């Protein structure tokens, strides 16, 4: 019930990138998050992006930016 944000990271070895799929509930904009941090975009509740970092570094980056969105995530 309390889940507002979901993320999937897919390693595309052929393209040499990490593909990121973001989903949210309510008014939390994964579009804004994706545009700001992962060269992507989409809709308020469904967006995608990419990273040229390794899978591990991409996940670390994602985790490191979450505190910036803490208030918005907790307001949902």
Model-derived features: where do they sit?
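Gly/His-enriched, cation/cofactor- and phosphate-binding structural elements
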Residues: 1-76
